[in-house]
């Protein structure tokens, strides 16, 4: 099975995986509206991959089979200042 990966034109480091290139039939319209114009990054055979960047390959495969798409959002940014203040015992 091939998988097409698109990056968002509106949200940084946000990617949409779909089963077929340029086929967004299974993706909710509200998600597409927030995602912006999908920009193709790559197409690859997902069955031959053992890992992906930050996404769990098993979750991606399962989502593609069940929902027809997988949305990868960036991990939350760590607030180093807040963490440092907490370690020092400083409260707001």
Curated annotation (Swiss-Prot):
Superkingdom of source: Bacteria
Domain YcgL: start-end pairs: 1-85
InterPro entries linked to this entry: YcgL-like_sf, YcgL_dom
Signal peptide: none
One Pfam family recorded for the sequence: YcgL
PANTHER family per the UniProt record, alphabetical: PROTEIN YCGL
Name of the protein this chain belongs to: YcgL domain-containing protein SO_2575
Taxonomic source organism: Shewanella oneidensis (strain ATCC 700550 / JCM 31522 / CIP 106686 / LMG 19005 / NCIMB 14063 / MR-1)
